Amino acid sequence: MNYSDKYEVLWATPIRTATRSCKPIQKYFEFDVIGEHGFQIPKGKEEYFFVLNTRNPYTRMISIYHLFCVHYKLIPNNFNNWIRKKLYEEIKFPGYTLDYEYFIKKRITKTPDLLIRVESLYSDILKLPFFMDNSDELFDIVNDNILKNAYSSGYNYKEYYDQDLANYVYSYLEEDFVYFNYNKDSWKNGTP
């Protein structure tokens, strides 16, 4: 987990939650990088303001599918089969890849002070406690990186999900939906 002693902030960026967009901001503020996707709170930093990036679980599953399958040319027969297999594996090895709310409850007893949602990345980043105290230069850094790595679901949920698969994903990741306040039926309108 990345942190800043100067601002007393911890910032966790789980896999597929805009890490590339947030890293230059962390660099600008001279955060120490302990692990891009790690959840371990460094000793003595337990009381720091805790920022956590999050993403709609439906979109996150599609993004992970593309990361692990398409990018590495390990394309299974289809998303439906792949996600069912991965979620089943998650039962055997909890917290491995898909269910990151698990990490928070099992490894971190601290509730996030600020959620940065991938779907509202720009406006949420502006809520960082140290943001308003800094120069306009930061606006350029945020704009450049958010635009460069712009969140675009780029995915039409209806191409990936039907009611049966959405129910299946929700049944495994219900705690993520509830904890991070994402709508169970968000896949129905096609995009998050």
Regions found by a protein language model. Give the residues of each.
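Membrane-interface amphipathic segments in extracytoplasmic regions
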Residues: 1-192
